[in-house]
């Protein structure tokens, strides 16, 4: 009896000491944070990881509207001005045992008017351990910073295989180029203004060229030597170019020699160009320049020709730029001409938005 009373008393005491609770409410679990986009800073700004991979992707491009002024700048009518619009856009990198593997695709869409539009593949190539193969621009596409120099190829975009060695600020490379849209024997038309005429043949025979490029920087001085041999035309060209910081600006000088009209250089037998890019203020750069070339009959037959010009770059506000250029060309045995253009551009590093993250870059010009 006593044991039963003790057990009942203990049970009553335990029940009294236990609080009465209602049924537990349903509480939603906190969502797991999801990392949609990860920044990839191994190759510079603008790259992000493709989700689920260790491959870095960069999406960039521009939209550009530009008005050109001159003698028939459009080439299809007698107008002295022409407006064109172009859109370009990507690059991808990943690490390999041989170093970074880079893949680049650049598409460009052009519109001269509502009925004259096209889309082209501007670049597409693979690059690893100094080897590059695909469609890309050659060293002959480089030039001085202004718009007066005429020291480059008419066509600089080729299907090529290239190896470029780099060490610090020095590089040296060799490329084999397909010159299918270059200058050909029997198709060259003399009597035109150098640098303003398309010397290419439509879907010409596959031609082969070999080019080299050497360049680098040393303090305030930068330099580049470029050469090319056009196998079918059996002619070649070589060019030297350098810049040095002097006073409030940068002085640039270039010279080029061509043994005959070829796909690497066809504007003149020889030419020299000089400019001085004056940094007037933090926002304003003024670049006067001069070009002089000897153009014999087997090139354009214009004799000696010279050109002077002025290019002005101005940063209106952050990421908003304006550019204007005017050029005057006076050939000895041809008519003089004046040309120029004006463009404004908005540049931004914001193409892709994610929570707390913005990726890519774009330029809008008009």
Swiss-Prot record:
Keywords: Cell outer membrane, Ion transport, Membrane, Porin, Signal, Transmembrane, Transmembrane beta strand, Transport. One of its GO terms (molecular function) is porin activity. It is found in: Cell outer membrane. Attached covalently to peptidoglycan. GO terms for cellular component: cell outer membrane; pore complex. One of its GO terms (biological process) is monoatomic ion transport. Its main location: membrane. Pfam families: Porin_2. It comes from the Bacteria. Residues 1-22 form the signal peptide. Belongs to the alphaproteobacteria porin family. May act as an outer membrane pore. Forms calcium-stabilized oligomers. This is Outer membrane protein IIIA.
């Amino acid at each position: 009896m006593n044991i039963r009373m003790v057990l009942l008393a203990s049970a009553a005491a335990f029940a009294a000491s236990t609080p009465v609770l209602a049924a537990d409410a349903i509480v939603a679990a906190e969502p797991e944070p999801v990392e949609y986009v990860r920044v990839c800073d191994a190759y510079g700004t603008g790259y992000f990881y493709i989700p689920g991979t260790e491959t870095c992707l960069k999406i960039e491009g521009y939209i550009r509207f530009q008005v050109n002024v001159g003698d028939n700048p459009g080439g299809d009518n007698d107008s002295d001005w022409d407006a064109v619009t172009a859109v370009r856009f990507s690059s991808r990198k990943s690490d390999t045992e041989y170093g970074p593997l880079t893949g680049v695709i650049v598409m460009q869409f052009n519109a001269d008017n509502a009925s004259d539009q096209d889309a082209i593949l501007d670049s597409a190539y693979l690059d690893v351990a100094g080897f590059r193969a695909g469609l890309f621009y050659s060293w002959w596409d480089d030039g001085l910073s202004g718009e007066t120099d005429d020291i480059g190829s008419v066509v600089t975009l080729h299907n090529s295989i290239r190896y470029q060695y780099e060490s610090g600020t020095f590089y040296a490379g060799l490329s084999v180029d397909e010159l299918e849209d270059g200058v050909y024997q029997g198709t060259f038309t003399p009597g035109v203004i150098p640098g303003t005429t398309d010397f290419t043949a439509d879907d010409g025979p596959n031609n082969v060229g070999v080019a080299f490029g050497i360049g680098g920087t040393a303090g305030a001085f930068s330099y580049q030597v470029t050469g090319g041999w056009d196998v079918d035309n059996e002619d070649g060209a070589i060019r030297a170019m350098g810049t040095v910081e002097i006073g409030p600006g940068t002085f640039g000088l270039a010279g080029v020699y061509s043994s005959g009209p070829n796909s690497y250089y066809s504007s003149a037998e020889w030419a020299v160009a000089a400019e001085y890019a004056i940094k007037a203020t933090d926002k304003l750069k003024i670049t006067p320049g001069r070009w002089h070339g000897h153009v014999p009959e087997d090139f354009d037959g214009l004799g000696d020709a010279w050109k002077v010009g002025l290019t002005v770059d101005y940063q209106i506000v952050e990421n908003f730029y304006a550019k204007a250029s005017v050029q005057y060309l006076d050939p000895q045995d041809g008519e003089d001409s004046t040309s120029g253009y004006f463009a404004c551009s908005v540049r931004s590093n914001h193409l892709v938005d994610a929570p707390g993250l913005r990726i890519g870059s774009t330029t809008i010009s008009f």
